[in-house]
Amino acid sequence: LTNYILSEDEKYPFFFPVNGPSKASVTSMRNANYPHHSSLFFGCDKVNGGNYWQEGLERGQIISLRADILESGGERAVIENECIWRRPGADAPIKDKRTITVTAPSKDKFILDFDVTMEMLLDVTIQKTNHSLFSGRMDPDLAVTNGGTMINAEGEIGEKGTFGKRSAWMDYNGKRMGGTEGMAIIQHPSNEWFPAPWFTRDYGFFSPTPMYWPENEKTTDLKKGDVLKLRYRVIVHAGNEKEERMIAAASHVF
């Protein structure tokens, strides 16, 4: 279904492939224009002057300290992962702990729950940035530019209809190999900034991105010792309209 990639040679941990019912990944892994789009990932730019999003390990890196498989077998697996946010010549601003739960209730669907607790090790200032938090980059076959559909909980579609809009979830799907498949990202109602506005692109990128629309229009400021808990659900699925009803229902129960 998916691999969770942990390597000191990578910018941050990420998921790839993220296989749909066709057995091909619904996400893409970097390209010439956007080499920092690593499939399905979590990061942030402009954190106390560091960049924990774009290429260049010297600019900032999210490094795995520990990863444990808590549960494995049948249709369910659970991983716990601790990470530190580091860059040369600066104190680490953040450490985080992730709990990743993957379930496969049917051959046409799997669910990935990504729960992250971020602890501020310093006073943290995040400058306004469109590079923030949980994000997905779809395979070009499924992008709006190639006939795919991006739709939010309110039924608004495409980059024009969804960019900057607050919505509980977003689904991205398209036709491939004779069928329709896609991936939805759902924000948990307990999340700070819920529902965060979305940064969306018809070429395949989508992310609930609160740091691009900060309340003071300049920065997101967190104090040393602050704890930020965020939860996201990813549903990789066949179909579209029927699945969107299922996604809407799932947004209330995880």
Predicted regions and their residues:
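Active-site/ligand-binding surface loops and adjacent short beta/alpha elements
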Residues: 123-195
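Beta-strand-rich recognition/accessory modules
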Residues: 185-254
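Hydrophobic residues positioned within well-ordered beta-strands of beta-sheet architectures
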Residues: 79-81, 96-98, 112-114, 134, ...
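A short, structured loop/turn motif at beta-sheet edges
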Residues: 68-77, 104-108, 175-180, 190-194, ...
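Beta-strand-rich N-terminal accessory domains
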Residues: 1-35, 241, 247
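Beta-strand elements of well-folded, non-transmembrane domains
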Residues: 22, 83-87, 100-104, 118-122, ...
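Acidic (Asp/Glu-rich), glycine- and aromatic
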Residues: 4-19, 105-150
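Extended, loop-rich substrate-binding clefts of extracytoplasmic carbohydrate-active enzymes
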Residues: 38-108
